[in-house]
Swiss-Prot record:
This is Adenine phosphoribosyltransferase. The keyword Transferase applies. Pathway: Purine metabolism; AMP biosynthesis via salvage pathway; AMP from adenine: step 1/1. Pfam families: Pribosyltran. It comes from Vibrio campbellii (strain ATCC BAA-1116). CDD domains: PRTases_typeI. Its EC number is 2.4.2.7. The lineage of its organism: Bacteria, Pseudomonadati, Pseudomonadota, Gammaproteobacteria, Vibrionales. It is found in: Cytoplasm.
Length: 181
């Protein structure tokens, strides 16, 4: 991973002040997606890191995790599994709830998407509190999958999600770190 590549990716991510509410500095990965060179560099970095680890599935969380997880899965030659909000998946699912700052949310996965012994890489765009990936990890493990790695484009380390996920036994990797919330 070169400093030049990281700089390209980092500079393609726009920061939006006071979105979605006052006091939040939002890191917008859609601007990265608009830059084909930065988007490809992001996928290439993830492929280089994970290509020889023997994963059998990549799981992406709704919704921006799909944008990085699906192309990564294709490049790794493995299946992609979406984890979605309730009612969005047509086959039988299991669900896992998790706490938000003000309330509770739930994620679902198809019951047949992960089989016993699958070696799973979890991917999302941004790591803040870690609640989404904790719930995703619990779903995968409930189905018998082995998950030890989680990859992100962005980490906000001040919020502490990386420590939370490390407490679950996950190796956390992020391409870029940004200060703030």
């Amino acid at each position: 991973m070169t400093t030049e590549t990281i700089s390209l990716i980092r500079s393609s991510i726009k920061s939006i002040q006071d979105y979605p509410k006052p006091g939040i500095l939002f890191r917008d990965v859609t601007s990265l997606l608009e830059d084909a060179k930065a988007y490809q560099a992001t996928i290439n970095l993830l492929v280089d890191r994970y290509k020889d680890m023997g994963f059998t599935k990549v799981v992406g969380t709704e919704a921006r995790g799909f944008l990085f997880g699906a192309p990564l899965a294709l490049e790794l030659g493995v299946g992609f599994v979406p984890v979605r909000k309730p009612g969005k998946l047509p086959r039988p699912t299991i669900a896992q709830s998790y706490e938000l700052e003000y309330g509770v949310d739930t994620l679902e996965i198809h019951t047949d998407a992960i089989v016993e012994g699958d070696k799973v890489l979890v991917v999302d765009d941004l790591l803040a509190t870690g609640g989404t990936i904790e719930a995703t990890t619990k779903l995968i493990r409930q189905l018998g999958g082995e998950v030890e790695h989680a990859a992100f484009v962005i980490n906000l380390p001040e919020i502490g999600g990386d420590k939370r996920l490390e407490g679950l036994g996950l190796n956390v990797y992020s391409i870029c770190e940004f200060e703030g919330h």
